[in-house]
Regions:
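N-terminal intrinsically disordered, cationic/polar leader segments
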Residues: 1-137
């Protein structure tokens, strides 16, 4: 059950990873168009504008969050596969907290309906996993 749920999370994460670069370009282009519209007839330093757009694009980039999320998924699978008799429930709970944190940050940075739908799916599945993990030792 846990691995099935984790596979659903990974599928949604994969879709977000595929969508993220295009969404970043769309956001950058939309921002550039908005600034040009606002600055019509006003002298604007193109270099400064490019710098500001780059800073905003960096704030919208979810690559780091997705990378950390993927590493938490690997750690979760490895922990589930442990056969040394050590309790795994707490560790899995901590990993789920980190996954949820990355999902929340990704959602807040996304500003994209398609990506947000996948973030909601991830959060739903993480909650289902958490309910089951609470019963593990």
């Amino acid at each position: 059950y846990l691995l099935e749920r984790l596979s659903i999370v990974e599928g949604a994460l994969g879709r977000i990873t595929e969508r993220a670069p295009a969404r970043l370009v769309e956001q950058r282009d939309r921002l550039r168009a908005s600034v040009q519209e606002l600055a019509a007839g006003v002298a604007v330093d193109d270099q400064r504008l490019a710098q500001e757009i780059a800073i905003l694009a960096d704030r919208l980039d979810v690559h780091e969050e997705l990378s950390r999320f993927a590493s938490h998924n690997v750690a979760f699978r490895q922990t589930l596969a442990r056969r040394d008799g050590e309790p795994v429930g707490k560790r899995l709970g901590f990993l789920l907290q980190e996954m949820l944190r990355e999902a929340n940050t990704t959602g807040s940075k996304s500003n994209d309906a398609v990506m947000l739908a996948d973030v909601v799916t991830i959060k739903e599945e993480l909650e289902r996993i958490r309910e089951q993990v609470e019963n593990l030792e």
